[in-house]
UniProtKB/Swiss-Prot annotation:
Disulfide bonds: none
Family assignment from sequence similarity: Belongs to the bacterial ribosomal protein bL19 family.
Keyword Ribonucleoprotein: yes
Protein name from the UniProt record: Large ribosomal subunit protein bL19
GO MF annotation list: structural constituent of ribosome
Lineage start: Bacteria, Bacillati, Bacillota, Bacilli, Bacillales
GO biological process, one term: translation
The protein's role, per its UniProt record: This protein is located at the 30S-50S ribosomal subunit interface and may play a role in the structure and function of the aminoacyl-tRNA binding site.
UniProt keywords, alphabetically: Ribonucleoprotein, Ribosomal protein
InterPro entries: Ribosomal_bL19, Ribosomal_bL19_CS, Ribosomal_bL19_sf, Translation_prot_SH3-like_sf
Amino acid sequence: MMHHLIQEITKEQLRTDLPDFRPGDTVRVHVKVIEGNRERIQVFEGVVIKRRGAGISETFTVRKVSYGVGVERTFPVHTPKIAKLEVVRRGKVRRAKLYYLRQLRGKAARIKEIVR
């Protein structure tokens, strides 16, 4: 009984407006950031290196290199803090978790693009 109640509550929270994306795709995440009493949109663009979980607790991690420093940020998929998510490029990869990209530098860290 309690399980069905939890499912009903989480079903209302799930987002359906996000595009389909996978590890290897380059995405642009528009995040709502609250600074003091004002809210603004911050854009974080990078490669999706992993997706994990299912349902309301599903998350994804985006990696980018900013001023020579690798930055990874993990977002819940169904959070209201994501204003918009756009897929910039579709990548062709053969792994679900792209942790090996952390060791690669420069052109070696590129991912082949595919047309899906």
